[in-house]
Amino acid sequence: MQDNTNDKELVLQAMREYGRSKAAQLQEASAEMTGTELYAQEQYIPDFQAAKAAMNMSQRKLGENDGFLCRSTAGHVVRLIGSYDSDVWPGEPETLLSQWKFVWAKDPKKARPFLALSTSPYDTGDCCTYPAEDETLHVYRSGKDGNVWPPRTLNVQWTDLGPVGGPYIEEDA
């Protein structure tokens, strides 16, 4: 019987190289992509903790639209907009809000927990999750650009699409 260990290692190595290549291509193309497109490719967006371990954030590319892209442990896709020493400040992007621009998706299945951030407001169609009146987690869609107010705030345009996990109510259905 033949030992397939070498074949298995070759396949794993090829898969890792493919993943690294796709991740690098995504970083390059991300400036032209929407939040929805980025979340659809999130398997190629590096985990924040792994990225921080590989290279200090002070050495990563900064940019409002083309800065380094990663995914927080909470699942938010974020872009580095402010330099900082991640050895000194090791916290997740949710704890260093001025260093990161959060990216939102219009796909309700990719909605992430609501964050009130003036640096990363929700635009028309962007989705988030937030507790409904009965305290169950629902998906909400922003009805205006520059929205920094949480869903269910009086006189703020959000549409309740239903409980997390769907099915989701679509306005044009």
Locate each region found by the language model.
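Tryptophan-rich substrate-binding surfaces of secreted polymer-degrading and adhesive proteins
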Residues: 2-173
